[in-house]
Amino acid sequence: MEFLVQKIGMSRTIDANSTPVTLLKVLQAKVCQLENGKALVAYAMHKKHNKAIEGQQKKYQLSKEFNHFATLKASQQKELGDLDLSALETLKRVKASFKTKGRGFAGVMKRWNFQGGPAAHGSRFHRRPGSIGNREWPGRVQKGRKMAGHYGNELVTCQNEVLSFDKESMVLVLKGSVAGFSGAYGRIRAV
C-alpha cells in the first residue's frame, strides 16, 4: 500500500532519550480508477489548472482542488472514493521515497568531496578535478569518472520506523530523517 505525503520538517521527541523525528503530512487522495492492484488517485497540490486537468476532473466527478494525478500500489483498496488510510495506524516500518535537494551544476569538491589543490604560494590548482585519463591506452575517459555536473534532485528511498500517526491532523511521525527539503512531496509504502 502506497501513500502520498508532504514533508513538514524535522523535530525531536521530548523525553530522556531525545530522538530525531521527521513529520510527514499524509495527503488526502481520491481513488479514480482501480486496475491490477494499482490505483489512479487525484490529490490537491498548488493551484495549477488547465483544460486537460479540467477534463479529468469532469470524467471522474472531482472538485476543483483535486488537480494532480498519480498511480499508487493499492492492493487493499476495493472501491473508488477516498483512499483508505486505516493501514497507517498499524504500520511499524515504511519505505520513504523523496527527491534530494537540487544543487544545480556543482564542481568536484562539492559533488564528490575532492580535496582540491594548495590554496596559495603560486598554485593555480585550487578547485579543479586534475587528470581524468590514463595513457595512449585506453585513449579515452573511462565510464563512471567523477566529474563536475548536476548534483542532487535524485530519488532516494530509505527505511524508517513509524513512531505514531495522528488520524485527525493526518501527521505521520517517522524516526530519523528522509531526503528532500521541508515542503517536498514524496511517497511512503509499507515494508
UniProtKB/Swiss-Prot annotation:
Sorted alphabetically, which keywords does the UniProt record give? Ribonucleoprotein, Ribosomal protein, RNA-binding, rRNA-binding
- Segments forming a coiled coil: none
Where is the stretch described as Disordered? 119-138
Single GO molecular-function term? structural constituent of ribosome
- Hey, which family's this protein in? Belongs to the universal ribosomal protein uL3 family.
PANTHER family from the entry?
Answer: 50S RIBOSOMAL PROTEIN L3 (PTHR11229), LARGE RIBOSOMAL SUBUNIT PROTEIN UL3C (PTHR11229:SF16)
Q: How does it assemble?
A: Part of the 50S ribosomal subunit. Forms a cluster with proteins L14 and L19.
This chain's protein is named Large ribosomal subunit protein uL3
Its lineage reads: Bacteria, Pseudomonadati, Campylobacterota, Epsilonproteobacteria, Campylobacterales
* Gene that encodes it: rplC
